[in-house]
Amino acid sequence: MALKYKLILASGSPRRVDLLNQAGIEPSRLMPMDIDEAPKKSEHPRSLARRLSAEKAEAALAAIKGDITWKGSYILSADTVVAVGRRILGKAEFADEALNSLHLLSGRNHMVYTGVCLVTPDRKVRQKIVETKVRFKRLSGFEIENYLASGQWRGKAGAYGIQGLAGTFVQKMVGSYTNVVGLPLYETILLLTGEGFDVHSRWPEG
């Protein structure tokens, strides 16, 4: 079946691509957007996730302006923020940053917020914000040391990916699992189908 609309994913995250693939969606183009992700003064983590997802979508829209190839396409973006209270735990790039985040998360509840933004072919902007409460077990020094050695914390909000080794740290979770991975699948599909993107016709036949 010829599919009418193209989908640009304004992200380079393999996890978000995998989640879309799980739903039978293959993005037509990946466009990682290099924006300033620093929170504003006193900005709530929820507001940060919402703002950054919108800014990524806006940047992608500006990048394809005038390119007839992508005229009439959908643009999807997302941003995930991990926070303990109002303290935002950024993407860990160095081991000491990851260590600090793990000490904060150990034995505590934290929140994972993902803002999802969709720009439609007629350039309407639709957004959803999804939150999940996660509780880590109390981590031993041995667990932290070995997790740091694995390198799985690199580039991840809060220094962990629930789909990897850190999944063994999760004692309890309330809310969407895919939200913690990086793209709340249920809510994303609702956004797409609500704006005329035919998800189910993309499913493979057996």
Curated annotation (Swiss-Prot):
The active site is at 79 (proton acceptor). The record marks 15, 80, 163 as: Important for substrate specificity. Disulfide bonds: none annotated. Its cofactor is a divalent metal cation. This is dTTP/UTP pyrophosphatase. It comes from Rhizobium johnstonii (strain DSM 114642 / LMG 32736 / 3841). Pfam families: Maf. GO terms for biological process: nucleotide metabolic process. Signal peptide: none annotated. Its EC number is 3.6.1.9. It is an enzyme of class 3 (hydrolase).
